[in-house]
Structure formats: C-alpha cells, structure tokens
C-alpha cells in the first residue's frame, strides 16, 4: 500500500515504514504529524485517485529529525569591475517516518 501526499508545495510517494525528507514542519522531534492532503492511495489493484484530494484519507507520520541541508554556495562577480559577492544558504528540512496510511 502506498500513497502520494502533498506537503510544502511538493508531492511525495510514501509507503508505511518509509522515511522521507520534507520541507520544514513546525513540529517537535518525536511528535506525530498528519498529512491530510492525500492525492492518491493504492492498495494492490484498488487505486483511489482524488479530485483533487481523496476524501477521508490521511497519512500519519512520526517526526524523526529537524535539520538543515548541506550549504549551497552562490558566487557572483563582474569582470574588470572588482565586484564580487558570495552567499551561502542551508535549506531546513524535517525527516519523517510514515507509520500509517488510512483510506
């Protein structure tokens, strides 16, 4: 059984027991989160596709970790002008483990 959920502007294919890195959620480590925006639920040959969401479906997951990705460095320069700038960015993420898919 698997489902496609929508969170943080992205879509993820998840199954029970899967660990997924999603955009930062406002939840403490060890707490449970519920994803109500379920686009598709498949259980063998039984496939439910939402229009746009599946009614009554939800995915329950446990927050494993809050963290930041590796740093992405951006460097801009203008030749012959002695002008340059260097920026760094670390995107925050939340690692969740899917516990239950209800449809």
UniProtKB/Swiss-Prot annotation:
Keyword Transcription regulation part of the UniProt annotation: no
NCBIfam families reported for this sequence: L21
This protein's UniProt keywords: Ribonucleoprotein, Ribosomal protein, RNA-binding, rRNA-binding
InterPro entries associated with the record: bL21-like, bL21-like_sf, Ribosomal_bL21, Ribosomal_bL21_CS
Description of how the protein assembles with itself and partners: Part of the 50S ribosomal subunit. Contacts protein L20.
Any one GO MF annotation of this record: rRNA binding
PANTHER family the record matches: 50S RIBOSOMAL PROTEIN L21, LARGE RIBOSOMAL SUBUNIT PROTEIN BL21M
Protein name per UniProt: Large ribosomal subunit protein bL21
Keyword Transferase: no
Gene Ontology biological process terms from the UniProt entry: translation
Record gene name: rplU
SUPFAM superfamilies: L21p-like
Coiled coil region boundaries: none
Domain of life: Bacteria
Described function: This protein binds to 23S rRNA in the presence of protein L20.
Similarity section: Belongs to the bacterial ribosomal protein bL21 family.
GO CC annotation terms, alphabetical: cytoplasm; ribonucleoprotein complex; ribosome
Pfam family, one: Ribosomal_L21p
């Amino acid at each position: 059984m698997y489902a496609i959920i929508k969170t943080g502007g992205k879509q993820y294919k998840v199954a029970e027991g899967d660990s997924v890195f999603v955009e930062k959620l406002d939840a403490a480590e060890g707490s449970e989160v519920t994803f109500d925006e379920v686009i598709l639920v498949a259980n063998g040959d039984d496939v439910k596709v939402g229009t746009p969401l599946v009614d009554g479906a939800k995915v329950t997951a446990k927050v494993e970790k809050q963290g930041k990705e590796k740093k992405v460095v951006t460097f801009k320069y203008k030749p012959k002008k002695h002008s340059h700038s260097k920026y760094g960015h670390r995107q925050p993420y939340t690692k969740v483990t899917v516990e239950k898919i209800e449809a």
